[in-house]
Amino acid sequence: MPDPAKTAPKKKSKKAVT
């Protein structure tokens, strides 16, 4: 699963997934 922050840099809601 690729980093959600890289697939959707506009979405900061899932940025704390790492």
UniProtKB/Swiss-Prot annotation:
**GO BP terms in the entry:** defense response to bacterium; defense response to fungus; killing of cells of another organism
Is the keyword Amino-acid biosynthesis in the record? no
Keyword Lipoprotein listed? The answer is: no
Q: Classify the main location.
A: nucleus
GO MF term list: DNA binding
How is the protein modified post-translationally, according to the record? Answer: Phosphorylated during apoptosis; which facilitates apoptotic chromatin condensation.
Q: One cellular component GO annotation, for this chain's record?
A: nucleus
Q: Which residues carry this modification: Phosphoserine?
A: S13
Family label? Belongs to the histone H2B family.
Q: Note the subunit structure.
A: The nucleosome is a histone octamer containing two molecules each of H2A, H2B, H3 and H4 assembled in one H3-H4 heterotetramer and two H2A-H2B heterodimers. The octamer wraps approximately 147 bp of DNA.
- Tell me the protein's name: Histone H2B 3
Source organism per entry reads Ictalurus punctatus
